[in-house]
Amino acid sequence: MRMMLRVSIPVEAGNAAVKAGTLGSTIERILADLKPEAAYFFADDDGNRSGSIVFDLKDSSQVPAIAEPWFLAFNAKVSLRPVMNPQDLATAGPSIGKAAQQHGK
C-alpha cells in the first residue's frame, strides 16, 4: 500500500546533527533502507526540518522498523497515512461512485 510518511525533526536535534556532520548521512541511510518512491524535504510551519516520504508498505508489521530510525536518530515526530496517485484514484473511481449511490443524499 502506498503510504506517506511525514517526519518532523525538532530544531535542537536537527542542529545537533548538522553540527556533528551526520544529518545528511543519517537521512540517506534511513532512506536507503526504506527505498521510497519519492522524498521531499522542507521547513514545516513550526520551523522544524521536515520531510514527506512516499513508499510502499507491504505489511503493517513494518511500521516500527520505518518509524523507529527517525525516533532514535532525531527524536522526530512521525505520522503515516495511506495516499493515492492519479492512477490509484482512477482505479478507485467506480467504488467512489457506488458509495455515492448507496450512501449519498
Set out the residue ranges of the language-model regions.
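Conserved, structured core segments of small domains
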Residues: 1-105
